[in-house]
Swiss-Prot record:
Primary gene name: murI
Sorted UniProt keywords: Cell shape, Cell wall biogenesis/degradation, Isomerase, Peptidoglycan synthesis
Binding site for substrate: 32-33, 64-65, 97-98, 209-210
PROSITE patterns, A to Z: ASP_GLU_RACEMASE_1, ASP_GLU_RACEMASE_2
UniProt catalytic activity: L-glutamate = D-glutamate
Pathway, per record: Cell wall biogenesis; peptidoglycan biosynthesis
Function statement: Provides the (R)-glutamate required for cell wall biosynthesis.
Organism: Serratia proteamaculans (strain 568)
Documented EC number(s): 5.1.1.3
Active site: 96 (proton donor/acceptor), 208 (proton donor/acceptor)
UniProt record similarity statement: Belongs to the aspartate/glutamate racemases family.
Name of the molecule in the record: Glutamate racemase
Alphabetical list of InterPro entries matching this protein: Asp/Glu/hydantoin_racemase (IPR015942), Asp/Glu_race (IPR001920), Asp/Glu_racemase_AS_1 (IPR018187), Asp/Glu_racemase_AS_2 (IPR033134), Glu_race (IPR004391)
One GO term of the biological process aspect: regulation of cell shape
Superkingdom in the source lineage: Bacteria
Length: 287
């Protein structure tokens, strides 16, 4: 069975002891095209349980994996701006690999608050691999983008990197959160290029925030001893540091809430799931 690791962290994180009062409860926006960013939110909230969290997802333009870079940048700017007009944001986490690889410069130019992105954990994977074969499991867009290949060239020149892009895995993760079972034969078909290799990757980077939601099923399908690595814990530590270095943060006593771009039957079904993650309500964000 495969093993799930987190970037530069192989033990569970303990929550930072809380001395948070109403005066120090700043707002954190976690954004993704879908629900995959909940995997990042879980890690951040585990470390920083007493902040005010907003989760926003773009269920109108989902998925981002095969959208143009220009569209993604403009869309993310529009959504973050709409949230910022309604809430005093202390920090924004772009919990989407695709959006992170193209929109971070524009976001940091537009806004004064810190913006944290998610990038594939190529560097720790290259350090951990024993057989020198690292798999990057991501969307097709992330696999093809120049940024990803620059990461590989910078941190993994001594490794053989096997790239596997799949939008179907994103759909499977979304379906799982809606209560549907993940068919293992489908996973095996998607992963066939690796499973049929004489020496498959012994370390797999989960290069999409949806994919940690499928970790249990992936570990059943991948070869014994395969390590799975995601960036959630590293993002949580980065967020904690950035919050600790800011002064005069605006606090709120509002409940955690989620925003979508359109309300429909799917979002009605998703509301109990979001409530299970600590979000009291789900609202449409006018954009």
């Amino acid at each position: 069975m495969a093993t799930l690791l987190q970037e530069e962290n192989t033990t569970s994180l303990e929550a930072i002891p809380s001395n948070t009062t109403a005066k120090t409860r700043p707002t954190v926006l976690v954004f993704d095209s879908g629900v995959g960013g909940l995997s990042v939110y879980q890690e951040v909230r585990q470390l920083l349980p007493d902040l005010h969290y907003i989760y926003a997802f773009d269920n109108v333009a989902f998925p981002y994996g095969e959208k143009s870079e220009e569209f993604i940048v403009e869309r993310v700017l529009e959504i973050v701006s709409a949230v910022q007009q309604r809430h005093p944001l202390a920090i924004v986490i772009i919990a989407c690999n695709t959006a992170s690889t193209v929109s971070l410069p524009a976001l940091r130019e537009r806004f004064t608050f810190p913006v944290v992105g998610v990038v594939p954990a190529i560097k720790p994977a290259a350090r951990l691999t024993a057989n020198g074969v690292v798999g990057l499991l991501a969307t097709r867009g992330t696999v093809q983008r120049t940024y990803t290949h620059e990461l590989i060239a910078r941190f993994a020149t001594d490794c053989k990197i096997e790239l596997l892009g799949s939008s179907e895995l994103v759909e499977l993760a979304e379906a799982k959160l809606h209560g549907e079972a993940v068919p293992l034969p489908t996973l095996k078909k998607i992963l066939h290029p690796w499973l049929s290799m004489r020496e498959p990757p012994d370390t797999v980077v989960l290069g999409c925030t949806h994919f940690p939601l499928l970790a249990e099923e992936l570990m059943q399908v991948l070869p014994e001893g395969t390590r799975l690595i995601d960036s959630g814990a590293a993002i949580a530590r980065r967020t904690a540091w950035l919050i600790s270095t800011q002064e005069n943060l605006v606090s709120t006593q509002e409940d955690n809430l989620a925003y979508c771009m359109a309300l429909n039957e799917d979002t009605d079904a998703l509301l109990p799931v979001l409530q299970g993650y600590g979000f009291k309500s789900l609202k449409k964000l006018p954009v």
